[in-house]
């Protein structure tokens, strides 16, 4: 454990919160894979608290000394950390469970929060909260997965488990419990009254992002609105550092989830703005993050400005190529049947990402492009004067649109259904004109018959 507390003392001497947080990691560093085992072997359950107090005092003796109250707080934290490490190592050897790991890590989280409330932990140490909060969520997910696996176990004792555990009701029990503890960290940061330069408010967006991830995992994305409303109150009072002053990685994640939340609320214009900001901030080599942003930004742009993704844009994203390029090709060519087939092929992934219904609206754009082709194929009206500029034919028989839609759909479409489709196009401002039913024609505008397409 000497290595851990040497790093602890150095972090305190430098006031380096991220270095301090590494001493609370449940994952050993790559250059010291036996770190957790060394921590566990350095003491035992009977003398752990006294040993840790000795380690902290001796390691900080020649550096920045801690006062008695703060020392007591960190002794409690590292005692809880040692117990959590014990469960992690026991789990690796099959002698513990993820549920016990989660409970031990939850205790560490509570003790660390108490350190800020009761033992005067300074704001520069907040990356420690990032570390425990991040892994609290991951251990909660692991625990829930373990419980579900046991619930469906058909081996001896399975019936005993199922008697008191409803897998549908309790399938995310630990993650819901975790959400409550993350909100405690959120409140701890939000309600700090210290001056901004030494405030825990600098940890707020990291914690908000953890809560966003938790709510989306719980399929309760709407709960994110409560967090955003609370944040807005503090921003309006000028009691919060500007978002631009936080690390770029935190801003990218925050803007992504804010954009997705607006996307799910069908506020596509605002969603596009937030997602585009996340896209612009995202590092060019952060492909997984960029891919997640594009998964929602592409459908947004399809609806707001009818812009289709290009092969060049998706060059580094094979999964997105498979999902979006077939749809983009069908929309561009107006091939309704192929569009329906491409949407059906990707249905499972589209539904999982909650973009199916949005992409389904892309069929209107495909239909618009098909109708536009009919308009172009109609050619020009005969010029009344020799030197007059050519004017496209604007009176199109409904029968011509019916033939095109039937061919594009792969089946005969009833004339009344065609008229309904045309009326819908006009209503959505994808086509300008009106239907003259008594004459069986569509009269299109001489200028801008298909807005945004150059015709």
Swiss-Prot record:
Originating gene: CSN12
Top-level division of the source organism's lineage: Eukaryota
GO function terms (MF aspect): double-stranded DNA binding; RNA binding
Protein name (database record): Protein CSN12 homolog
Transmembrane segments: none
Sequence similarity: Belongs to the CSN12 family.
Naturally occurring in which organism (per UniProt): Gibberella zeae (strain ATCC MYA-4620 / CBS 123657 / FGSC 9075 / NRRL 31084 / PH-1)
Chain ranges of the PCI domain: 252-449
InterPro entries tied to this protein: Csn12-like (IPR045114), PCI_dom (IPR000717), WH-like_DNA-bd_sf (IPR036388)
């Amino acid at each position: 454990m000497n290595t851990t507390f040497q790093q602890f003392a150095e972090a305190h001497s430098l006031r380096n919160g991220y270095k301090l947080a590494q001493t609370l990691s449940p994952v050993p560093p790559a250059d010291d894979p036996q770190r957790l085992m060394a921590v566990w072997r350095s003491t035992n359950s009977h003398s752990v608290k006294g040993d840790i107090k000795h380690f902290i005092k001796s390691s900080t003796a020649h550096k920045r000394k801690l006062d008695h109250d703060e020392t007591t707080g960190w002794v409690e934290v590292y005692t809880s950390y040692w117990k959590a490490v014990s469960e992690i190592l026991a789990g690796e050897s099959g002698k513990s469970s993820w549920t016990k790991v989660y409970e031990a890590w939850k205790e560490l989280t509570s003790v660390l929060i108490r350190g800020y409330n009761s033992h005067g932990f300074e704001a520069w140490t907040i990356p420690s909260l990032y570390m425990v909060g991040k892994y609290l969520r991951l251990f909660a997910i692991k625990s829930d997965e373990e419980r579900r696996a046991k619930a469906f176990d058909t081996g001896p004792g399975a019936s005993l488990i199922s008697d008191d555990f409803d897998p549908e009701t309790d399938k995310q029990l630990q993650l819901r419990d975790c959400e409550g503890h993350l909100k405690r960290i959120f409140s701890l940061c939000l309600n700090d009254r210290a001056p901004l330069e030494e405030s825990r408010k600098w940890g707020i967006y990291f914690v908000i992002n953890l809560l966003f991830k938790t709510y989306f995992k719980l399929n309760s994305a709407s709960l994110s609105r409560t967090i955003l409303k609370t944040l807005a109150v503090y921003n309006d009072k000028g009691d919060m550092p500007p978002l631009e002053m936080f690390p770029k990685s935190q801003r990218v994640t925050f803007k992504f989830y804010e954009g997705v939340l607006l996307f799910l609320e069908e506020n596509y214009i605002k969603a596009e703005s937030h997602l585009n900001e996340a896209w612009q901030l995202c590092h060019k080599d952060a492909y997984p993050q960029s891919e997640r942003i594009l998964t929602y930004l592409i459908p947004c742009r399809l609806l707001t400005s009818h812009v289709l993704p290009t092969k060049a844009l998706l060059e580094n994203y094979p999964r997105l190529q498979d999902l979006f390029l077939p749809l983009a090709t069908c929309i561009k060519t107006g091939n309704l049947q192929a569009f329906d087939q491409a949407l059906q092929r990707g249905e499972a992934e589209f539904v999982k990402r909650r973009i199916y219904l949005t992409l389904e609206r892309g069929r209107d754009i495909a239909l618009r492009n098909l109708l536009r082709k009919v308009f172009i194929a109609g050619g020009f009206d005969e010029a009344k004067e020799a030197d007059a500029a050519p004017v496209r034919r604007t009176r199109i028989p409904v029968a011509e649109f019916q033939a095109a839609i039937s061919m594009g759909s792969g089946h005969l479409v009833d004339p009344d259904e065609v008229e309904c489709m045309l009326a819908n196009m006009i209503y959505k401002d994808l086509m300008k004109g009106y239907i003259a039913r008594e004459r069986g024609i569509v009269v299109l505008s001489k200028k801008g018959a298909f807005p945004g397409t150059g015709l």
